[in-house]
Amino acid sequence: MLKIKNLSTNYQVRKLTTSDVNRAFELVQSNPTYFAYCPPQATRHSILEDMKVVPANKSLDDKYYLGFFDDTKLIAILDLIMGYPDDESAWIGFFMVDATSQGKGIGSDIINDISDGIKVAGFKRIELAYAKGNSQSERFLLKNGFIKDGREVAVPGYTVVVMEKKL
């Protein structure tokens, strides 16, 4: 069982709700480079949809659409599915740090903390994907212990590169 409070040593973590949509929208708007590689641009409606979408054979009980807060400021969003794509894995569907908080080690701290929390919950790996060509995302993920697993998947509008981190 994943314990949300154990996912950060430096920030308050909680599930985001519909009342957080404006803050989440401001955060994603601060990162236009992401959407240049991974269209379309986010909207408030798409964020609300992302809060509840899960893969086939998964339920909302497996989904953690989380906000990381420094006091009252939302500094990062994480969309996490436990037990996907297999029972030993967790899938990060989305991770973004507010642009004003980037370059300070905050994203790496969060990735390290969530990796520890996911491992404590009994999972053996984290999988995710980034939009091919987005060198900023690629460098960040490689720096934080993710490796390419050799898969590239075409999705509407772009291709993603799948990576994993063994815990």
Model-identified regions with their sequence ranges:
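Short secondary-structure capping/turn micro-motifs that flank functional sites
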Residues: 44-45, 134-135, 157-158
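Glycine-rich acyl-CoA binding loop
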Residues: 103-108
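Acetyl-CoA-dependent GNAT
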Residues: 4-11, 15-21, 26-100, 111-113, ...
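Conserved GNAT acetyl-CoA-binding A-motif
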Residues: 118-129
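Conserved catalytic-core motifs of GNAT/GCN5-like acyltransferases
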Residues: 129-131, 142, 147-162
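Conserved short alpha-helix immediately C-terminal to the canonical SAM/SAH-binding motif I
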Residues: 110, 134-137
